[in-house]
């Protein structure tokens, strides 16, 4: 389905966008356009891969004109551009609105105008029952693409989304932070050891995107099932892998943190389709005439439950270590650390 097609990746220099790019470089895709504001990272990618399929566009999703320029002749869009740090969004919520909500509106408007075939919008577990500015902005982003999907024909532009949990070892995540502190001999700072988080690899996340490209219908949110761990057990697993004795320091929760993350709300779980390794949350396609819905009701919601990092499979320390060792980043860091200790 990707042969001789043009794919645009917004936020293409980030961890997620970069992983998607690498996946499609091995396909028969015609061209991959990397759209981001970071010219240094674009130059790094250009030099690293030296691949004629890669085309680079400097711009910001906040600027509709730069988006429109990059969108010409595009067949597929993977929209990953966002602000990703919860505390930063708490202190600058309007910036989160500009990038995550308005930026998504700009991408979708341009995609519709350019007759793009399919758009995948990247969301996060923080969008389900959100309590922080990043999660609220992502939840609104989901509302934007679902609303857009209601108002256009899927034969013209199919718009859907993916919602993922914590991507292990992605830029700005806790695993690189813990490893840096282990190497520096510093205490591992933990906000709350009993917090749970979903654990997905970048490869898992890319598989979710490919699954959405192949199977999602307009307005859908696709979710991949994932195990979780407590933050305390994750720190312990890394210390055991590195055979380190760093102290663990409890510093208390940061701005906007939740005890557990939710991938599906109770209301979504009642309506979702179980696809084996994935859930498909269909769009609420009702119009504003609720008379029939009020008469018939929906008893499924009262019998449903949310799918969160507390009630999925919670990994043991040994299972976490096995999962960590599947990550090339962790293996490389571990080898370097052991070599330095000889």
Give names to the regions the model predicted:
Residues 79, 83-139, 143:
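Conserved Rossmann-fold NAD(P)-dependent oxidoreductase catalytic core, especially the SDR/UDP-sugar
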Residues 143, 147-342:
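Strand-loop microenvironment adjacent to phosphate/nucleotide-handling motifs in alpha/beta enzyme folds
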Residues 10, 71-80, 121:
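Rossmann-fold scaffold of SDR-type NAD(P)-dependent oxidoreductases
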Residues 29-41:
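Conserved glycine-rich Rossmann-like NAD(P)H-binding loop of the short-chain dehydrogenase/reductase
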Residues 36, 58, 98, 192, ...:
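Conserved residues in the N-terminal Rossmann fold of short-chain dehydrogenase/reductase
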Residues 55-76:
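Conserved Rossmann-fold cofactor-binding substructure of NAD(P)-dependent oxidoreductases
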Residues 56, 96, 159-162:
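Hydrophobic/aromatic anchor residues within beta-strands of the central parallel beta-sheet
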Residues 5-27:
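N-terminal Rossmann NAD(P)H-binding glycine-rich loop of SDR-like oxidoreductase domains
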């Amino acid at each position: 389905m990707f042969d001789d097609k043009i794919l645009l990746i917004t936020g293409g220099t980030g961890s997620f966008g970069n992983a998607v790019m690498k996946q499609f470089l091995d396909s028969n895709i015609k061209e991959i356009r990397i759209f981001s504001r970071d010219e240094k990272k674009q130059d790094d990618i250009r030099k690293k891969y030296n691949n004629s399929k890669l085309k680079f566009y400097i711009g910001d999703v906040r600027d509709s004109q730069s988006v429109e320029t990059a969108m010409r002749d595009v067949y597929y869009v993977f929209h990953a551009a966002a602000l990703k740090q919860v505390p930063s969004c708490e202190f600058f919520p309007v910036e989160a609105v500009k990038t995550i909500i308005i930026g998504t509106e700009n991408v979708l408007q341009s995609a519709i105008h350019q007759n793009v075939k399919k758009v995948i919008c990247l969301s996060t577990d923080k969008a389900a029952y959100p309590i922080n500015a990043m999660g609220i902005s992502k939840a609104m982003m989901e509302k934007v693409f679902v609303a857009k999907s209601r108002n256009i024909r899927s034969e013209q532009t199919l718009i859907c989304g993916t919602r993922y949990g914590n991507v292990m070892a992605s830029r700005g995540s806790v695993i690189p932070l813990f490893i840096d502190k282990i190497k520096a001999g510093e205490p591992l700072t933990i906000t709350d050891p009993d917090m749970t988080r979903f654990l997905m690899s970048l490869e898992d996340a890319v598989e979710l995107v490919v699954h959405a490209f192949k199977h999602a219908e307009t307005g859908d949110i696709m979710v991949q099932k994932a195990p979780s761990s407590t933050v305390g057990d994750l720190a312990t697993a890394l210390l055991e892998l590195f055979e380190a004795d760093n102290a663990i320091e409890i510093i208390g929760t940061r701005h906007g943190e939740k005890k557990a993350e939710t991938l599906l709300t109770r209301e979504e779980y009642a309506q979702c389709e179980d696809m084996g390794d994935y859930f498909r949350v269909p769009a609420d396609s009702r119009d504003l005439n609720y008379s029939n819905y009020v008469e018939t009701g929906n008893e499924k919601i009262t019998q449903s439950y949310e799918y969160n990092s507390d009630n999925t499979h919670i990994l043991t320390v040994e299972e976490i270590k096995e999962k960590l060792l599947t990550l090339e980043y962790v293996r490389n860091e571990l080898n370097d650390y052991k070599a330095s200790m000889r």
